[in-house]
């Protein structure tokens, strides 16, 4: 080991890099066998990765297309909910029409969301019309309490209407509730808190 250090010093003086490895480490590497031979234990990603909630919350506020009423609301959940809602295509089905004239990105135009009808429902899918998600006069998004809101997204059960043939048991159609139902309680609560903060709008129906 002493000889190795002397050689390393000489190399360093010559401007060359040097790595000294102890004999015990070399012995450990040479005698290791099979899949259990590990000299370094990697740290779990979760423990070393930074918490990016703050960036998602700020991104949510940046994406919100309407003024938000934050009185009595959890600001962090509102921001996170805005991020989820505004990056999950909710506007495409729950705003009628989703974009103002000249603001449809699918037509190659700069995106301009229709804020006058934002998330107020009214898109006609033939036998299904999208729901108004804005707060009612009691401040309840879609007229649902938080528990009801989470129940709907977990089960798809339509609490507003009975089942209509061919759709039995009042299950929501078109709305991708099986996807949203897999989100955490915190994420669903954040969506609800965001919807509580947006302005009320009457349903915007399609022109006759």
Regions flagged by a language model, labelled:
Residues 81, 87-97, 149, 191, ...:
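The canonical Cys-X-X-Cys-His
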Residues 92-96, 161-168, 172, 202-208:
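Surface-exposed patches in mature extracellular/periplasmic domains of secreted proteins
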Residues 109-152, 177-187:
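Electron-transfer interface patches adjacent to heme c in soluble/periplasmic c-type cytochromes
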Residues 144-159, 173, 177-205:
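C-terminal capping alpha-helices of c-type cytochrome domains
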């Amino acid at each position: 080991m002493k000889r190795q250090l002397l050689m390393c010093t000489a190399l360093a003086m010559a401007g060359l890099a040097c790595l000294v490895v102890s004999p015990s480490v070399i012995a450990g590497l040479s005698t290791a066998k099979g899949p259990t031979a590990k000299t370094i234990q990697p740290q779990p990603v979760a423990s070393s990765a930074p918490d990016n909630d703050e960036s998602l919350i700020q991104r949510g506020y940046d994406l919100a297309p309407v003024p938000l009423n934050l009185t009595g609301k959890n600001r962090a959940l509102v921001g996170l909910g805005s991020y989820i809602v505004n990056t999950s295509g909710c506007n495409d089905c729950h705003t009628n029409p989703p974009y103002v004239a000249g603001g449809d990105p699918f037509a190659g135009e700069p995106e301009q969301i229709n804020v006058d009808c934002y998330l107020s429902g009214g898109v006609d899918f033939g036998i299904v019309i999208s729901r108004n998600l804005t707060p009612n006069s009691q401040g309840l998004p879609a007229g649902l309490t938080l528990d009801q809101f989470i129940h709907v997204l977990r089960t798809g059960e339509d609490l507003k209407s009975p089942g209509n043939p061919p759709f039995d048991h009042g299950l929501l159609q078109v709305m991708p509730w099986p996807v949203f139902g897999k989100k955490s309680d915190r994420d669903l609560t954040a969506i609800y808190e965001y919807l509580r903060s947006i302005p009320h709008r009457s349903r915007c129906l399609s022109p006759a």
